[in-house]
């Protein structure tokens, strides 16, 4: 019995050591499924339509193809073709045909498709990475920062900056760092979109910027974009390191050994 357990354990360790790292990654769910959009019943017509096609030629005493005493093709006592007590063709208690019990035509239908629900995983992911700005093509808005103290080389510009720094942005727009090859590209894109968006928004409110304002704004935003890049890079590498750590063969062996001790 002990040799059998030892042999099984050696086989498990061998398989775990050579297992593909890709198995640790979460596979995307296939598309489709229940309540994923589209018509669940593509072959159905409107609920108020005829459930049976009209039949030509009736029997004895049928002027328009119905039963005995049916002037317009319905059941007994049906003036316009419906079930018992149906004046215009429908189910019992249906005044104008079609639908289930208590349904007048297309009004008050049962089993309506439910409204699509918000995917909370996507909401949580967006909240963790930053607020996604829909009108800016996938850019995210970073958290608020303290405006840096910058010296511009002259007393006039330094004083002007201290007096007007509250008019400059304290948040930057950016894309995920994995979409850029280096820090310079990230910062360049971050500065351009942030200055442009802030200028347009502020100008719409009736406030204009001078050339001095634009110059200082670019310097301020550049420093904040560098800070944002450092934050995002650190978080990105930490996530990558965690994935590599838990998918390495030694860690898999250790976890398998602990599971064996607990179960055995």
Curated annotation (Swiss-Prot):
Chain positions recorded as Cu(2+) 2 binding sites: 80-82
| Binding annotation for Cu(2+) 4 | 96, 98-99
For Cu(2+) 3, which residues are the binding ones? Answer: 88-90
So which residues have sugars stuck on them? 192, 208
The job of this chain, per UniProt, is described as: Its primary physiological function is unclear. May play a role in neuronal development and synaptic plasticity. May be required for neuronal myelin sheath maintenance. May promote myelin homeostasis through acting as an agonist for ADGRG6 receptor. May play a role in iron uptake and iron homeostasis. Soluble oligomers are toxic to cultured neuroblastoma cells and induce apoptosis (in vitro). Association with GPC1 (via its heparan sulfate chains) targets PRNP to lipid rafts. Also provides Cu(2+) or Zn(2+) for the ascorbate-mediated GPC1 deaminase degradation of its heparan sulfate side chains.
Q: What else is known?
A: This protein is produced by a bicistronic gene which also produces the major prion protein/PRNP from an overlapping reading frame.
What is the protein's name according to its record?
Answer: Major prion protein
Q: Which organism is it from?
A: Bos taurus (Bovine)
What would be the name of the gene that encodes this protein? PRNP
